[in-house]
Design a protein with these regions (language model features):
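PLP-dependent amino-acid enzyme catalytic core
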Residues: 1-235, 242, 246, 253-254
């Protein structure tokens, strides 16, 4: 396969069966790590920037400013590098150094906020930067409709195409902004009315199920902001961070 741009390789990620770990069930993982930036957030990074270009909110030579806890920043940094935009990422100082190094490799700059203020503090600081920077634009991933729309246009149809011969019974996914689970559910529910959609969130920050957001990210970073989109979910299991980490280790050891 030949592509004119790395951005053309975003999406169309494979589905991989994890049969050794779940021998009695037909369980598949949609491997979003196959995106060039390593996560599903590449989709929204490209979608939000291109939507802003079409609307005129982001002009050539402009500056992108976004509060992010990690993967969205990587996606935005990759897209900004290809398209020639300056990118300022605002995040709590507690966020992963490894992720920061990757964003830096794409040419992004950082503004780190106090750990105790969490993502709310990062959002407040990002708004200050936008207000004082000519030509600046803030994607606002927690509120941007393009965050949901890209999953209606791409992720949902990809799932439907791969499982057209055998409808899925349930989709289980973690939740950050809510854009992924909302968009996928909106697209798939009309095709598969009996589909159950489950959002999984950490015990330290059970926002969707009615709990309080954590003031600090957990050791295994997860959502800590109470600004998640209303989603089309059937249930919201709350999982302990240690258990989910152990399960991820088992999946890696048994199926790669």
């Amino acid at each position: 396969m030949k592509f004119d741009s790395i951005l053309s390789t975003i999406g169309q990620t494979p589905h991989v069966r994890v049969s050794r770990l779940f021998p009695d069930h037909d369980v598949w993982i949609k491997s979003e790590r196959a995106n060039p930036g390593g996560s599903i957030k590449d989709r929204i990074g490209l979608a939000m920037i291109e939507d802003a270009e079409r609307s005129g909110a982001l002009l050539p030579g402009g500056t992108i400013v976004e509060p992010t806890s990690g993967n969205t920043g990587i996606g935005l940094a990759m897209v900004a590098a290809v398209k020639g935009y300056k990118l300022i990422l605002v995040m709590p100082e507690s966020m992963s150094v490894e992720r920061r190094r990757l964003m830096l490799a794409y040419g992004a700059s950082f503004d780190l906020t106090p750990r105790e203020k969490g993502m709310k503090g990062a959002i407040e600081r990002a708004l200050e930067i936008v207000a004082s920077t000519p030509g600046a634009w803030m994607p606002q991933q927690f509120e941007n409709p393009a965050n949901i729309d890209v999953h209606v246009r791409t992720t949902g149809p990809e799932i439907l195409a791969d499982f057209a011969d055998k409808p899925i019974d349930a989709i289980i996914t973690g939740v950050g902004t809510g854009g992924h689970i909302t968009g996928v559910a909106q697209f798939l529910k009309p095709h598969w009315p009996n589909l159950k959609v489950y959002a999984v969130e950490p015990t330290l920050s059970p926002v969707i199920s009615g709990g309080a957001p954590s003031p600090q990210p957990s050791a295994k970073e997860g959502p800590n902001l109470g600004a998640v989109t209303t989603v089309l979910v059937g249930n919201v299991p709350v999982m302990a961070g240690l258990w989910t980490t152990q399960l991820a280790d088992e999946v890696a050891k048994s199926g790669g």
